[in-house]
UniProtKB/Swiss-Prot annotation:
Induction: Constitutively expressed. Up-regulated by fenofibrate. Its cofactor is heme. GO terms for biological process: arachidonate metabolic process; epoxygenase P450 pathway; icosanoid biosynthetic process; organic acid metabolic process; response to testosterone; xenobiotic metabolic process. This is Cytochrome P450 2C23. Gene3D superfamilies: Cytochrome P450. GO terms for molecular function: arachidonate 11,12-epoxygenase activity; arachidonate 14,15-epoxygenase activity; arachidonate epoxygenase activity; heme binding; iron ion binding; monooxygenase activity; oxidoreductase activity, acting on paired donors, with incorporation or reduction of molecular oxygen, reduced flavin or flavoprotein as one donor, and incorporation of one atom of oxygen. It comes from Rattus norvegicus. Signal peptide: none annotated.
Length: 494
């Protein structure tokens, strides 16, 4: 027993010494990195962060250290970019050097470097190019992408009509619609909202979305080499990701039986055709594991982000009934109450378009982009960032910039309207990030938000259960995403 105790103590001391040595070695090179608060061994700058509101902590540090500074999450340095000028300079002007994907261990450990979002190098380029082309040429089958979204908008309205103007929580049903659009893209089919298979898929996606924003997952990302061997929520998280991948692979088996390369029906068909096309290439990136992870990425990125934006949008329109009234007036005047909205209507709906943009700006759904990494030793301003260093561009610092938006903390569609009431574009609108690592589904997300939003407002008036002034619209802030507070509403048919 004494020998066991001594061995355990020696192991703990060794790990501690190695960690201290690692920090010390990194600190020796800090002269090349931007300035920042001095890190402590093992925990880095954790004490400078409010884990319940990391974006606010990062903005506060920018006031002290400037728009480019270094922060240690655990033992690893991260360069934080705060403000439009430095974010643009890094992601656009020096985009090729900042092209890497920084680590997010809770995801990396399950994706193993495959897929669209957390891959790097040539694999990432191949998967992104294929996915962009597939989505862009989505005349697969007999329906365009817009027609698929319009169909889902109609189904969403039918489902919402069943609430009969009674109070309900919109969280689940607003997630069903974008999830079904991804189902349509991936395997050319949609589900009824009460389908058991669909409900199980929604449950997997929702639980992991909630969990990736938890403090536990943030702890895992700081010390993955230790926590991965402990019991905890990360095990359930990984199991659910595997379940989503297995669900996709079952659909792949069905597609393999009826594949016609000359007439691809969906994303899976296109991917299977590429697998066949490159079957003699031993280094091909087109294989079933990559297909499963790409499909999982599309579900994760394409379901909860869109539904959360819609949910936040409805809450804001109840908070500001005068804005809702103006949207109703414009929709009635331009489209009427019976013609389904289409993308060609967008140019004729400047106020509605401004409201949609302001919702996305105001909520800053993703306060920072997913982490980047420099792919080589990179000269940036007065600093040299070593190859592989994580870089965190703060999108909220761009969309809440007082130089561009007169009242950035206030919800005001006027931020996107000129003096004539026409829609006004701005380079400071970056909810999908910037550069080559910008969201691959940006065009789809924009289409979904416009068609779902206009269809809902065309058919319903939004009624709050309390006085508008008493509605809480303060986001539930975490390290990764901003969520609206829970609420119920009544949808009154128009």
């Amino acid at each position: 027993m004494e020998l066991l105790g001594f061995t355990t103590l020696a192991l703990v001391v060794s790990v501690t010494c190695l960690s201290l040595l690692s920090v010390w070695t990194k600190l020796r090179t800090r002269g090349r990195l931007p300035p920042g608060p001095t890190p402590l061994p093992i925990i880095g700058n954790l004490l400078q962060l409010n884990l319940k509101d990391i974006p606010a902590s990062l903005s506060k540090l920018a006031k002290e250290y400037g728009p480019v500074y270094t922060l240690y999450f655990g033992t690893s340095p991260t360069v934080v970019l705060h403000g439009y000028d430095v974010v643009k300079e890094a992601l656009l002007q020096q985009g090729d050097e900042f092209l890497g994907r920084g680590p997010l261990p809770i995801i990396e450990d399950t994706h193993k470097g495959y897929g669209l979002i957390f891959s790097n190098g040539e694999r990432w380029k191949v998967m992104r190019r294929f996915s962009l082309m597939t989505l862009r040429n989505f005349g697969m089958g007999k329906r365009s992408l817009e027609e698929r979204v319009q169909e889902e908008a109609r189904c969403l309205v039918e489902e919402l009509q069943k609430t009969k103007a009674q109070p309900f929580d919109p969280t689940f049903i607003l997630a069903c619609a974008p999830c079904n659009v991804i189902c349509s893209i991936l395997f050319n089919d949609r589900f009824q909202y009460n389908d058991k298979t669909f409900l199980n898929l929604m449950d997997l996606l929702n639980k992991n979305f909630q969990q990736v924003n938890s403090v536990w997952c943030q702890m895992y990302n700081l010390w993955p080499t230790i926590i991965k061997y402990l019991p905890g929520k990360h095990i359930e998280f990984a199991k659910r990701i595997d379940d989503v991948k297995n669900f996709i692979l079952e659909k792949v088996k069905e597609h393999q039986k009826s594949l016609d390369p000359a007439n691809p029906r969906d994303y899976i068909d296109c991917f299977l055709s590429k697998i066949e096309e490159e079957k003699d290439n031993l280094k091909s990136e087109f294989h079933l594991e990559n297909l499963a992870v790409c499909g999982s990425n599309l579900f994760t990125a394409g379901t909860e982000t869109t539904s959360t934006t819609l949910r936040f949008g409805l809450l804001l329109l109840m908070k500001y009934p005068e804005v809702q009234a103006k949207v109703h007036e414009e929709l009635d005047r331009v489209i009427g109450r019976h013609q389904p909205p289409s993308m060609k209507d967008k140019m004729k709906l400047p106020y509605t378009d401004a409201v949609l943009h302001e919702i996305q700006r105001y909520i800053t759904l993703l306060p920072s982009s997913l982490p980047h990494a420099v792919v080589q030793d990179t000269k940036f301003r007065d600093y040299v960032i070593p190859k592989g260093t994580t870089v965190l561009p703060m999108l909220s610092s761009v969309m809440l910039d007082q130089k561009e938006f007169a009242n950035p903390e206030k919800f005001d569609p006027g931020h996107f309207l000129d003096k004539n009431g026409c829609f006004k574009k701005t380079d400071y609108f970056v909810p999908f990030s910037l550069g080559k690592r910008a969201c691959v589904g940006e065009s789809l997300a924009r289409m979904e938000l416009f068609l779902f939003f206009t269809t809902l407002l065309q058919k319903f008036s939004l009624k709050t259960l309390v006085e508008p002034k008493d509605l809480d619209i303060k986001p539930i802030t975490t390290g990764i995403i901003n969520l609206p507070p829970p609420y119920k509403l009544c949808l009154v048919p128009r």
